[in-house]
Amino acid sequence: MRALVSPALALALTLGVSVAALSSTPALAAPENYATIRMKTDTAFLSPEERKVVNLLIQAADQMTAIYDKQAVAQGGADGPGHGFYPPGMTKAEFETYLAAHPDQKASLMDAYTVVRREGDKLVAVPYSVAYKPELTKAAALLDEAAKVTTNASLKRFLTLRAQSFRSNDYFQSEMAWMDLEGTPIEVAIGPYETYTDEMIGQKAAFEAFVTLKNPTESQALDKYKAYLRDMEANLPVADAYKNFKRGGASPIAVAEQIRGGGDNLHGPQTVAFNLPNDERVREAKGAKKVILSNVLAAKYEGILSPIASRVLVADQAALVSQKYMTLETLFHELSHSLGPGSITVAGRATTVSAELKDIAGTAEEAKADVMGAWNILFMMEKNEIPAAERPQLFATYTAGIFRAARWGDEEAHGRGAALQYGYLKAKGAFVFDPAAKRYRIDDAKMAAGIRDLVADIVKLQGDGDYAGMVAFFDRYAHLDDDARGVIATLKDIPVDITPVYPAKV
């Protein structure tokens, strides 16, 4: 291992962070190749009441980590793709065979908020509220206490209802209340959300927490884009049958600094934004909230994306990569999660994209959001909301971002999604490898066409609920060739990702 001077210096100068450890190994996405960053966030503006609430939420977030530790690894046996959600040693084929033989149990066993356990020859669904009762009881008590402290009515309502959800296993009302948070700098998401950890079926939600503080000025600057959501849906390069105008249009946008993470949020590559909730019922009623974690994004740009650009792209295009377009891509990635098929009909059955695409649903959705985010920025350029002359900056930043994510490995949803984008767009001629420069050159016209075509192909497969088709699509394109692997091999001294360390309290 060796210390990384340049990324550390960039991070320290830009963010005022101290770098606890930086190291490098040949393995892609190995934990040793993460930069450990002690994050500092401005909390001076918090009132004593808000400070007390935040510190209670930090404690509750730690309970999400305790639960996730049980979910991420099989309990009492060898670990596998089902991790702690399913019985040790269970295979996908065994589970699906059981479901076919016991259709009356399918709803409970496939529920996002249950753990599957064996009882003799039977499988039983254990609600999260029972399986993780000790941790959820502690978390609920902390949320109840925070609800008593805050005088903000919307935050009080959300925290009270979320505490009830932890006890009842019913999250609908608290998800609805979360969408209505207003009048407070505190933006907290806490509970079972993403399903990436369930690598067997892709249905079980992992517990996590984001404790953040909003920046109202930066949030307002980006808020204008949500008014275009219906126009973005209409502009998708697919037939109207694949477009979804049923989701709610509220879709709040917040720019925030994260002051604590918990559970799945702390595992593996750090997210720079989130788009929640995932419950299609809530999305159809109220839309979804997009939160950009500005301090995490800045750390990744300065320490990872910016130095990657000069190794991946020819010099004149590497110079175009910018934090502005990383931020815009992040925003439009999250907006794009609210676009395209969600609730669908397959062979006369009412179902969802997630249910039909199973274990590949999350990976496909991340690839969709990446490329559709770029497509929607191009649309905003057509609407004169973003300078059209900056299209080369968009393409350069987007391409560098593909390589940043590809380093996470093809076992990780975003990493495999990046490999798909690489393989597809290279096949379309969107970029070519320059052997002399040992770097890539982007063809702007072919990149624009490739982005359009990739959006269309993914959305159609999602809308059809075509599991076999999506698997075949990834099998065809989600590969890094020798050129890509050669370029990635030059990035070993640049961290794959960051491990942020947050204060124990504010």
Please tell me what each predicted stretch does:
Residues A8-A21:
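Bacterial N-terminal signal peptides
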Residues D111, V124-S322:
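Contiguous, non-catalytic segments that form substrate-binding/exosite surfaces or channel walls
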Residues N152, G362-F379:
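An active-site-proximal "capping" alpha-helix that borders the catalytic cofactor pocket
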Residues L328-G342, A369, A374:
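Active-site recognition of the HExxH zinc-binding catalytic motif
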Residues A374-M470:
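Long, well-structured alpha-helical subdomains associated
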